């Protein structure tokens, strides 16, 4: 059988003149701005126009473009090779779909149709599910399929916050950086969300907590000083916390070394390479931090690629039901945005 694996990620501008249209695509997403289209369009234009100058400075730090597509291609190639090595009864081909920049679903679907798979497997590169990330990408894919009258067996791997190899991949990368550190604060930093999203039933924060708890318990380091915090807050709304910035300032001032783990990002991009590596390091230095280390995103870590491969290959063994994996509901029932409870 031929199987197409669709890897979803956010995307990023490939040159400075595309920063503003990238931002427009981000804010025009109804999962980000939940407004009627006639209001969402002008507001997205306004926000993207106002934020473009600051965002361009960020991408100038990265050489004028986001590295996320190249890094996702590396992940895609590694996963495709792993899948075809591990399961020689099927032929796998991986495709990349970015939500806010190229390659977009509307273009990639034609490549998928040319491959003519017996099954399409949707695999977000977001380990923890949120309606604003995985949910938005999955929804767009189904919309594009409907527009193109494309009907094929489709399975969805919605999330994998506690998958064993995913956890091991993080532990491996953390150990490399902390093995010689003393008197440090281990900070797990995830992208934040407005508090109202969580109150409406988005399982993201709960799933991030499950990831971190699993890692900390498996590391089993006596008296490990750790915390989970959230970064990248924008706008006037109240966001989930504590904020990574506040945690860095507080611990730098009391003489703690900082070890920072990007727990919800699996590839490097502006929010790791600029926000974590430059802006937050400057913040730590300014407040007296004597040493600041940043654990890398998982990238093509062997355990992480094995995690993705296991999810794709073993979903049948785990009795995939109603085209959604994981088969057992992981999230408590109050998280109504969890696709296992209420697929959108």
Model region roles, listed by residue range:
Residues 1-344:
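Active-site-proximal alpha-helix that buttresses catalytic centers in soluble enzyme cores
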């Amino acid at each position: 059988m031929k199987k197409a694996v669709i890897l979803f990620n956010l995307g990023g501008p490939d040159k400075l003149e595309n920063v503003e249209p990238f931002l427009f695509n981000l804010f025009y997403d109804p999962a980000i701005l939940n407004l009627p289209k006639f209001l969402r369009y002008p507001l997205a234009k306004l926000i993207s126009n106002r934020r473009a100058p600051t965002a361009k400075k960020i991408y100038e730090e990265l050489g004028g473009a986001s590295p996320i597509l190249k890094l996702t291609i590396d992940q895609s190639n590694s996963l495709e090779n792993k899948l075809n090595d591990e399961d020689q009864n099927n032929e796998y081909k991986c495709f990349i779909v970015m939500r806010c920049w190229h390659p977009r679903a509307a273009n990639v679907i034609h490549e998928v149709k040319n491959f003519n798979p017996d099954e399409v497997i949707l695999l977000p590169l977001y380990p923890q599910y949120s309606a604003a990330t995985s949910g938005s990408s999955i929804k767009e894919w189904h919309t594009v399929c409907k527009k193109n009258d494309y009907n094929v067996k489709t399975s969805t791997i919605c999330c994998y916050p506690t998958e064993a190899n995913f956890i091991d991949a993080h532990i491996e990368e953390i150990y490399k950086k902390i093995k010689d550190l003393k008197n440090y604060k281990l900070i797990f930093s995830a992208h934040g969300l407005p508090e109202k999203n969580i109150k409406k039933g988005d399982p993201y924060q709960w799933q991030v907590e499950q990831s971190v708890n699993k890692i900390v318990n498996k590391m089993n380091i006596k008296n490990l000083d750790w915390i989970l915090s959230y970064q990248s807050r924008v706008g006037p709304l109240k966001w989930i916390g504590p904020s990574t910035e506040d945690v860095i300032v507080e611990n730098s001032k009391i003489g703690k070394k900082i070890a920072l783990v990007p727990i919800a990002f699996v590839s490097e991009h502006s929010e790791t390479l600029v926000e974590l590596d430059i802006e937050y390091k400057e913040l730590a230095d300014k407040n007296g931090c004597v040493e600041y280390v940043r654990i890398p995103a998982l990238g093509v870590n062997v355990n992480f690629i094995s995690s993705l491969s296991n999810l794709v290959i073993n979903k049948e063994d785990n009795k995939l039901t109603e085209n959604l994996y994981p088969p057992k509901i992981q999230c408590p029932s109050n998280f109504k945005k969890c696709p296992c409870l209420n697929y959108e």
